[in-house]
Amino acid sequence: MTEETPGFEEKPDVPSGATPDDAEPQAASEEGAAPAGDASENAGLVAQLDQVRTALNERTADLQRLQAEYQNYRRRVERDRVAVKEVAVANLLSELLPVLDDVGRAREHGELVGGFKSVAESLETTVAKLGLQQFGKEGEPFDPTIHEALMHSYAPDVTETTCVAILQPGYRIGERTIRPARVAVAEPQPGAQTVKPAEDAAEAQDSSGAEDDAGTKESGGPDEG
């Protein structure tokens, strides 16, 4: 029976004729392959990172676009809501204008007394809170966008078409005119603008003649020959 000698291990099989120097190139090639593999892996990670960044930028742009569209939608809905409210209020107040006209006539004739006066004042306060404004005053220039001329006349003391009487007041809500003011207007007297310059020229000529006479008197008259 063969006994193993303590302290000795079996040696690996080594090809015949191999030397220790033959193992060094193999180890060097394995060490050189490792950095090349790391560089390839890093390049792949960089490419993936670029793809993720591109996708993130695209999604961010999509979210920003959706947010802008939503904000525009909210503003449009709010604008439409305000417009619908204004139209509804205007339609309601238009139905109350004849009542307000009756209240105004009663006030002019001194008939706005008692309980009728309280109801009328309450109505006027309510419509004012809803934004109803009355307009139209005597003496203001005629504006066809807010005035409706029912009567025409001529007056020598006006230089432009002027409202001389308010037959029915106008009403508006903000910039929206519910009813134009119905008025009587006076226009400048025909020929007044042409006569006045002639009168001014005559007055200027008379004044010039008077100055010439005064100068002649101061100089002692013409020289005696």
From Swiss-Prot:
InterPro entries: GrpE, GrpE_coiled_coil, GrpE_head. The keyword Cytoplasm applies. It comes from the Bacteria. Keywords: Chaperone, Cytoplasm, Stress response. One of its GO terms (cellular component) is cytoplasm. Transmembrane segments: none annotated. CDD domains: GrpE. Its main location: cytoplasm. Belongs to the GrpE family. Participates actively in the response to hyperosmotic and heat shock by preventing the aggregation of stress-denatured proteins, in association with DnaK and GrpE. It is the nucleotide exchange factor for DnaK and may function as a thermosensor. Unfolded proteins bind initially to DnaJ; upon interaction with the DnaJ-bound protein, DnaK hydrolyzes its bound ATP, resulting in the formation of a stable complex. GrpE releases ADP from DnaK; ATP binding to DnaK triggers the release of the substrate protein, thus completing the reaction cycle. This is Protein GrpE. The lineage of its organism: Bacteria, Bacillati, Actinomycetota, Actinomycetes, Kitasatosporales.
